Amino acid sequence: MRKFSFSIILMAGLVLTGLLLSGCSKEPVNHTKGVYMLLDTSGTYALELKKAQNIINYLLGKLQPLDSFAVARIDSGSFSEKDIIHKVTFDSRPSMTTNQKRVFAQKVDDFIKGVKSSPYTDISGGMLQGVEWLDESKTGKRIILVFSDMEEELPEGHKRDFTIPFNNTHVVALNVTKLRSDIVDPREYMDRLSVWQAKVEAGGGSWEVINDLDNLQDILD
């Protein structure tokens, strides 16, 4: 009987040890969010930037300490850190985070007040710069927001016909306004979005379109 009891105790001890070891071996879950937002500044679309500013202010209200946020412009050659308007990783202290958000909002406001329209729209380059920034931020959830009509126009010589390594990045196209040609033939609009969806998914990302800006409540989930 004693031998039987000792065996039970030994087995229970081994099971408990195994559970403790397995619990210790699990890596902590990274709940931080990284958001990289691209603003189309080409042609008449620059007139839409006040809407983008409202979205940015909404996101600033939602993002938490240790989350990362960057806003960049889309112009003739967007694969460049020079196009980043402002970027930040929020401090762990709420009081510091509040001040960082205030500075961020002011930087964006200054940019929009003085923005100059770009003749070209290098969306792919902006996305690639966003992926690079998200890689460096090492956040748990990766989001690229593209405020644009999604009509890419590249300067002569720029090459963008390659797969972008989105690597589990969720890409959201916002406020995709319809061009005059889209109104004449709606298939152009649908085809344009389908091409972008295929490009994102080919690189291991996920794709979403939000045109009704009242539906932003789940954008960070």
Residue ranges and their predicted role:
Residues 33, 118-168:
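Exposed acidic/Ser/Thr-rich ligand/metal-binding surfaces
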Residues 189-221:
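C-terminal helix of von Willebrand factor
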Residues 150-195:
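VWA/integrin I-like adhesion module and closely mimicked acidic/polar interface patches used
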Residues 25-27:
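Bacterial signal peptide processing site
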Residues 31-141, 143-145, 177-180, 213-217:
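Von Willebrand factor
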Residues 1-11:
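Bacterial N-terminal signal peptides that target proteins for export
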Residues 20-23:
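C-terminal motif of bacterial Sec signal peptides marking the signal peptidase cleavage site
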